[in-house]
């Protein structure tokens, strides 16, 4: 009998549409001869299942089940979370699933909450001896002078929401008198803002996952953008070249992969994660930018690219991850 898998997408953030595209990718990747897939859409207004005819039926939040039009009650064996942003990337949905006893594909509540808060995550990684960019955090209502920012971090700086992804609300600021404007822009996306030192170098990203007691480290992707930085437009409107495997030395590749593996273990991750880095031009230690616990899974996203470059079959990888969660519940 096939296992019932909920593809949980949507969410409450500006990354709603991106999440739906990831769900489309996963729907094509996951083995439907082995699993019954159900698209579950979460919005602030409703949690519902999208049926084959395009209609929607509500999720029963008591146990995350639903009733089909013919009266059959469907209970899921596992939830594959592909929400980018709240509540699927910040630990809230994971906590709910923990309470009702439903296995899920991604990191647990603590790891998800930690990594979604960029400043807290980088400070934790710094405490573990991992190199991160210097930054100042501001909460709504707090202020910092332009002189303090420039003296502490130099210019340019990145100003971005402390929580969130897809570079929404992010600005690269090159002159001091534009800092406040960038802070206000970031505050439209979150109540906390990070002002982060710019680190020159090559941007790379590394995916990894653990299943059946074995860690799989994927080839690196090098990110080359014609925009000023890897912003939302570059990510989703083709203003970027993504080169997999990255054009770096084997030694540097191993260094980044080892750091990714170490971070996976430090935060207690599960499922697939992706860690973004800057490689300084002097060959010194890579700088961690952020950790992504629900990476994009469209057909052109980094993780599918890296899986293909590793010579793996993405359907088999998905099966491995799903079975690992089902067998370790």
Describe each region flagged by the PLM.
Residues 174-258, 281-287:
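Phosphate-binding site of ATP-dependent enzymes
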Residues 52-58, 95, 230-237, 293:
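Short, flexible, mixed-charge acidic loops at enzyme active sites
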Residues 38-40, 197, 204-205, 270-282:
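A short glycine-rich, hydrophobically flanked beta-strand micro-motif that places a catalytic Asp/Glu
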Residues 1-110, 114-116, 120, 139-148, ...:
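ATP-binding N-terminal substructure of ATP-dependent carboxylate-amine bond-forming enzymes
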Residues 36, 103, 131, 192, ...:
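Residue-level detector of anion-binding/catalytic polar loops
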Residues 3, 250-329:
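ATP-dependent carboxylate activation and anion-phosphoryl transfer catalytic cores
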Residues 2-9, 13, 114-202, 257:
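Active-site nucleotide/adenylate-binding loops and adjacent lid/helix of ATP-dependent enzymes
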């Amino acid at each position: 009998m096939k296992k019932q898998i909920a593809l949980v997408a949507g969410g409450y953030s500006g990354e709603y549409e991106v999440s739906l595209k990831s769900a489309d990718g996963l729907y094509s990747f996951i083995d439907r001869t082995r699993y019954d897939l159900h698209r579950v859409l979460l919005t602030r207004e409703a949690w519902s299942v999208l049926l084959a005819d395009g209609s929607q039926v509500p999720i029963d939040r008591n146990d995350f089940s639903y009733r089909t039009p013919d009266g059959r009650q469907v209970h899921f064996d596992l939830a594959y979370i592909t929400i980018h942003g709240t509540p699927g990337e910040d630990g809230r949905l994971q906590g709910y699933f923990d309470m009702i006893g439903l296995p899920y594909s991604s990191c647990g509540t603590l790891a998800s909450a930690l990594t979604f808060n960029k400043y807290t995550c980088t400070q934790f990684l710094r405490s573990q001896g991992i190199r991160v960019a210097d930054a100042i955090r501001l909460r709504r209502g707090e202020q910092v002078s332009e002189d303090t920012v420039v003296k502490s971090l130099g210019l340019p700086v990145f100003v971005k929401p402390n929580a969130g992804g897809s570079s929404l609300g992010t600005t690269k600021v090159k002159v001091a008198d534009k800092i406040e404007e960038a802070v206000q822009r970031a505050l439209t996306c979150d109540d906390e803002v990070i002002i982060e030192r710019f680190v020159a170098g090559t941007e790379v990203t590394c995916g990894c996952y653990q299943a059946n007691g074995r860690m799989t480290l994927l080839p690196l992707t090098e990110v080359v953008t014609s925009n000023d930085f890897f912003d939302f437009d570059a990510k989703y409107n083709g203003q970027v070249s993504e080169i997999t495997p990255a054009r770096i030395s084997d030694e540097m590749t191993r260094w980044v992969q080892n750091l990714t593996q170490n971070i996976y273990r430090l935060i207690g991750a599960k499922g697939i994660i992706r860690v973004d880095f800057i490689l300084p031009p002097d060959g010194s230690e890579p700088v961690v930018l952020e950790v992504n616990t629900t990476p994009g899974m469209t057909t052109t996203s980094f993780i599918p690219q890296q899986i293909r470059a590793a010579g793996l079959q993405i359907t088999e990888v998905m099966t491995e991850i799903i079975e690992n969660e089902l067998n370790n519940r």
